[in-house]
A protein has these predicted regions:
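Transmembrane signal-anchor helices characteristic of membrane glycosylation enzymes that use polyprenol
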Residues: 5-33, 110-114, 209-222
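Extracytoplasmic catalytic/substrate-binding loops of multi-pass membrane glycan-assembly enzymes
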Residues: 24-67, 328, 348
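Membrane-interface anchor segments at the N-terminal boundary of transmembrane helices
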Residues: 70-79, 318-408
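Transmembrane-helix motifs of polytopic, lipid-linked glycan transferases
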Residues: 74-99, 138, 142, 146, ...
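Membrane-interface transmembrane helices that cradle and orient dolichyl/undecaprenyl
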Residues: 141-158
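Membrane-interface alpha helices of multi-pass inner-membrane proteins
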Residues: 159-173, 208-214, 219
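Transmembrane-embedded, aromatic-rich helix segments that form part
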Residues: 161, 174-190
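Membrane-proximal stem/loop segments at transmembrane-domain junctions that anchor or position
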Residues: 231-352
Length: 414
């Protein structure tokens, strides 16, 4: 009778998860965002996996024209539903959760998606947006499910599955290098706990080298097939350059030795300064500064820095797209290296502001009340965790709680 009841409840969870995501996939359709064309057009600045996914759907549904994007949205929604369901069912079985608690666990990713759709400025869900987040958020849930399984039981199959998903994530978004840091933390912790440090070091080396080598080869092979150049994607430095320019002052440009690079920096700086994009235009408190940085980050990078560098290089140099993008990267690197010594203290303030912001903000619109709410929640969370460990030891629930807190901290820091 209990098995039948559990089976019926499992079907209910499946229907809730799948029905939720597919409803919005059909109701909203495929959502095109600012970054979407760069993935659709397979631009060299993007990691390979998501453009490859779009290409696959474009080939399979070639007769549908732009309608293939709806197929992508449906696929991403099914992936999101399966990821949420997989994590819920794993935790229900492993932690012996009741039906009510299991339903709450399932609702967490669903309600987060609703916040993205109805409360966040973006006003759409990631699961049906043509963005890397469309698969990355779901893959991260699956990564967490298998890594937590490894942490609790030490199952090598779960670890290597998590490592493979980490490879997929890094090949989708460079920011997902956080999964490697979580993977390393888990292996080190299990090795110390089981007193198998040498074996753990070997496993750690295999996982990290496998992920790094695999992502490098996929990146280079993809660019060779698409552009005829066995090289990695370009423009990674633009993210650092954006923050460097945000924290800079005009006189910092004097440190740039090459005249053309210095003039290029000054032209970019003037546009950003006039638009109020830079750090000195922000408020005094960390909350105001982090809000200002978030509001104007894209204005610096997408609207100003990136177009200025691309236009300058294409006007003054000749060559194929891959070679021109390498020149763009060289200009980026020159600005970063020259300005970094002067802007570094300000850069650290930006970093600290955004770590604090990341610890308290949500996908909802910013409001100061979240700061105090988050302080109370973190304190309560840590107190409850310590109390639980004292009473029950480092059991499955404690491991899940520690993993969640560590994932948040690494995510906001990276």
């Amino acid at each position: 009778m209990k098995k039948r009841s559990d089976a019926v409840f499992g079907v209910l969870l499946f229907l809730i998860s799948m029905g939720f995501y597919l409803f919005f996939a059909f109701y909203d359709g495929a959502v095109i965002c600012v970054d979407s064309p760069s993935y659709i057009n397979m631009e060299i600045s993007r990691e390979p996996l998501y453009p490859m996914l779009l290409l696959l759907f474009r080939q399979v549904f070639s007769s549908a024209g732009e309608g293939y994007l709806q197929g992508v949205a449906i696929f991403q929604s099914i992936l999101a539903a399966c990821a949420a369901l997989s994590l819920t069912c794993f935790l229900r079985k492993e932690l012996k959760l009741g039906k009510a608690v299991s339903l709450v666990v399932l609702m967490i990713p669903l309600l987060t998606s609703l916040l993205c759709r109805f409360a966040a400025k973006r006003a759409s869900m990631y699961s049906n947006s043509i963005l890397t987040e469309g698969i990355a958020t779901s893959l991260f849930l699956l990564f967490s499910r298998y890594l937590i399984d490894y942490c609790i039981k030490g199952k090598k199959k779960a670890l290597f599955t998590a490592a493979f998903i980490s490879f997929l994530l890094i090949s989708t978004r460079k920011q997902m290098v956080i999964t490697v840091l979580l993977l390393i933390s888990a292996i080190v912790w299990r090795s110390i706990r089981e007193k198998t440090v040498k074996k753990g070091l070997l496993i750690l080396t295999v996982c990290v080298l496998g992920i790094g080598t695999g992502s490098y080869l996929l990146d280079c092979s993809y660019n060779y097939c698409v552009r005829g150049s066995f090289s990695r994607h370009a423009n990674d430095d633009r993210f650092i350059d954006t923050v460097v320019i945000y924290a800079s002052e005009k006189e910092d440009g004097e440190a740039i030795k090459r005249d053309d690079t210095r003039e290029l920096f000054e032209s970019i700086y003037e546009i950003c300064d006039e638009g109020g994009y830079l750090m000195h235009s922000a408020g005094q408190g960390w909350y105001e500064r982090s809000a200002h940085f978030g509001d104007y980050y894209d204005c610096i990078q997408i609207d100003t820095l990136w177009p200025a560098l691309e236009q300058y290089v294409r006007e003054h140099y000749e060559g194929d797209n891959a070679s021109l993008e390498k020149i763009v990267d060289d200009y980026n690197a020159q600005i970063i290296v020259a300005l970094m010594p002067d802007v570094f203290p300000r850069l650290m303030r930006v970093f600290a502001d955004n770590v604090l912001n990341g610890m308290v903000t949500t996908v909802a619109k910013k409001t100061p009340v979240l700061v105090w709410y988050s302080v109370v929640v973190y304190i309560l969370y840590i107190v409850l965790l310590i109390t639980h460990v004292k009473r029950n030891g480092l059991d499955g629930r404690a491991i899940l709680a520690v993993y969640t807190l560590l994932a948040v901290m690494i995510n906001v820091a990276v």
